């Protein structure tokens, strides 16, 4: 999984593009490998001075990679800002998304 993602990213940047689009770069990866891929994308974006667009539902990736973040729902841009203001938004749909994708990871099922 992780090696295939790295190879895909390497192939995408081989021609030194101005733009890189990553569609769900962490899908199917374990949490540790996801962090490595996020850092790789972030580092390469800076090193090659390219604009990177990442389509993801992974809150950790959003906060790790995103300098500027856009929240799109049903084809409409509902919010845009940076990682420092994402939790201060008035956009209820975005707040619901953040809660669902953050709090759910911290719940341990029991009897």
What residue spans do the PLM features occupy?
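H-loop/switch region of ABC-family ATPase nucleotide-binding domains
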Residues: 56-57
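Helix N-cap at the start of a conserved alpha-helix in ABC-type nucleotide-binding domains
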Residues: 31-33
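Catalytic Walker B motif of ABC-type/P-loop ATPase nucleotide-binding domains
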Residues: 20-23
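A short, surface-exposed alpha-helical micro-motif characterized by mixed small hydrophobic
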Residues: 62-64
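A short, proline-enriched helix->beta-strand linker immediately N-terminal to the Walker B motif
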Residues: 14-18
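C-terminal boundary and immediately downstream tail of ABC-type ATPase nucleotide-binding domains
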Residues: 87-111
């Amino acid at each position: 999984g992780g090696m295939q993602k790295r190879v895909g990213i390497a192939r995408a940047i081989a021609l030194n593009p101005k733009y890189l689009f990553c569609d769900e770069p962490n899908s199917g990866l374990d949490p540790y490998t996801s962090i490595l891929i996020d850092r790789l994308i972030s580092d390469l974006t800076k090193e090659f001075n390219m604009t990177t667009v990442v389509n993801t539902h992974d809150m950790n990736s959003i906060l790790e990679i995103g300098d500027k973040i856009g929240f799109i729902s049903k084809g409409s841009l509902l919010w845009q800002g940076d990682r420092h203001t994402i939790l201060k938004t008035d956009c209820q749909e975005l707040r619901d998304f953040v809660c669902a994708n953050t709090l759910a990871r911290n719940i341990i099922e029991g009897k």
